Design a protein with these regions (language model features):
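N-terminal amphipathic/basic-hydrophobic helices that include classical n-h-c signal peptides
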Residues: 1-11
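Non-catalytic, conserved peripheral segments adjacent to functional cores
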Residues: 10-121, 130-131, 136-138, 148-150, ...
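Histidine-centered acyl-transfer/condensation active-site motif
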Residues: 145
């Protein structure tokens, strides 16, 4: 039976720093934002059973917490595996996905379904993606599940000039989501 004396309504919104501290998040040096890996499957998929391009065995799946603040963004990148983003709390996030076929789409990841937000978003393997907090937002807490599991060997950071040449109709968002280099 549930002990409702232990369940309290939220009295005030946490700050980003409180979330970082409570969830023991660390800066995501290569991408931006803050994260902590929370799960790495014990099951390992041999490289011989994986699609072309994987250099070694991979865990079946991995999961992280991921936090964005007004000072951070997720730099445009791609990974070799499918990613599934889950929205947990906070303000919505604007995500840009750039597909290998040249198409692009912007998705709002959040919990305001009436406004068209999506609480769960799939980023297919090989699709460039980056995201930022909506203007005026304080923070967004999400999760990201990757299968086959994430490995930095499968991570590629996007180069602004190459992305602008290929996806010129999204130049403003590409410029905002790529490091100044």
């Amino acid at each position: 039976m549930t002990d409702f004396r232990r369940i309290r309504p939220i009295k005030q919104m946490l700050t980003a720093q409180q979330i970082i501290d409570l969830l023991r998040l660390i800066p995501h040096e290569s991408e931006g934002g803050y994260f902590r890996e929370t799960y790495r499957a014990a099951t390992v998929i041999p490289a011989t059973a994986l699609p072309d391009g994987y250099s070694a065995d991979r865990n079946a799946s991995t999961a992280i917490y991921y936090l964005l603040t007004p000072e951070t963004f997720s730099a445009i990148h791609r990974v070799r595996s499918d990613e599934v983003f889950h929205f947990y709390a906070g303000d919505a996030v604007e995500m840009l996905q750039l597909s290998p076929d040249g198409t692009a789409r912007t998705i709002f990841v959040g919990n305001d379904l009436a406004a068209g937000h999506e609480p769960q978003v799939v980023v297919p393997a090989g699709v460039w993606q980056g995201c930022r907090l909506i203007p005026g937002g304080r923070w967004a807490l999400m999760g990201c599940t990757v299968a086959p599991g994430f490995d930095f060997a499968d991570f590629e950071l996007g180069k602004r000039d190459a992305l602008l040449a290929r996806y010129s109709t999204h130049s403003e968002l590409i410029a905002a989501l790529t490091p100044n280099s």
